[in-house]
């Protein structure tokens, strides 16, 4: 699969490296394809990765993965061009520092970042996934000592094909994908990301932790 990852920072780079190891072709969509942030991941991935300006990456990819900061999204969506029929996996979170210095969600509970992206990206098919953990857990999804229990990857979408792609890409990383419903469920997944961030950043925990699902 040709995966166009928009953004080559910590998250985009970690996803790109791991998916390349699983046999996918990675295209980083960035403002500066020659230098900047793409050099480290390109150097590590090798021939199965390339970098292009954002609209070219969008045209070349079978699926688009958004791995940019949330506040860049309006400009990024504009730069992506025609998105009709395209599948977009939104990995972003609308998290910001409020006036008290606490991490908060900027959109409240009446909508979500994923729904706003779907509104901006006319005609695109949007899924929310790969947003509930820090990048470290996508660089390496192995957690010894838990037997056959795999970390879970919660996702949501209104589109069946988008769901199938997320399922495959999650399994390729070593996760157990768990569908939570339509795109409106991003209103629950984004607060879950906020909880993870508060625990990892504000409570000083090691960021190498994920959610598991115990069944009986």
What is the meaning of each model-derived region?
Residues 23, 60-62, 124:
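Short, well-ordered alpha-helix to beta-strand connector turns
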Residues 1-44:
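NAD(P)+-binding Rossmann beta1-loop-alpha1 motif at the extreme N-terminus of oxidoreductases
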Residues 148-216:
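Active-site-lining helix/loop region of Rossmann-like oxidoreductase modules
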Residues 45-101:
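Rossmann-like NAD(P)-binding element
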Residues 79-85, 121, 145-147:
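Short, conserved loop/helix-junction motifs that constitute active-site signature segments
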Residues 91-144:
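Rossmann-fold NAD(P)-binding glycine/threonine-rich loop
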Residues 51, 125-129, 178-180:
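General beta-strand structural signal in soluble alpha/beta enzymes
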């Amino acid at each position: 699969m040709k995966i166009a990852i928009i953004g080559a920072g910590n998250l985009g780079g970690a996803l790109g490296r791991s998916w390349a190891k699983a046999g996918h072709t990675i295209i980083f969509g960035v403002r500066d394809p020659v230098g900047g942030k793409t050099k480290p991941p390109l150097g590590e991935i090798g021939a199965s990765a390339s970098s292009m300006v954002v609209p070219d990456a969008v045209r070349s990819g079978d699926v688009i993965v958004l791995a940019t900061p949330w506040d860049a999204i309006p400009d990024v969506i504009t730069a992506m061009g025609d998105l009709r029929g395209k599948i977009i996996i939104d990995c972003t979170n609308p998290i910001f520092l409020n006036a008290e210095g606490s991490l908060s969600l900027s959109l409240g509970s009446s909508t979500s970042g994923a729904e706003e992206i779907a509104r901006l990206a006319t005609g695109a098919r949007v899924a929310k996934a790969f947003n509930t953990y820090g990048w470290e857990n996508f660089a390496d999804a192995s957690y010894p000592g838990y037997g056959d229990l795999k970390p879970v990857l919660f996702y949501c979408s209104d589109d069946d094909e988008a769901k199938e792609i997320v399922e495959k890409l999650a399994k390729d990383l070593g996760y157990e994908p768990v569908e939570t419903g339509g795109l409106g469920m991003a209103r629950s997944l984004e607060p879950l990301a906020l909880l993870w961030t508060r625990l990892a950043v504000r409570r000083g925990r090691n960021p190498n932790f994920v959610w598991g699902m115990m069944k009986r």
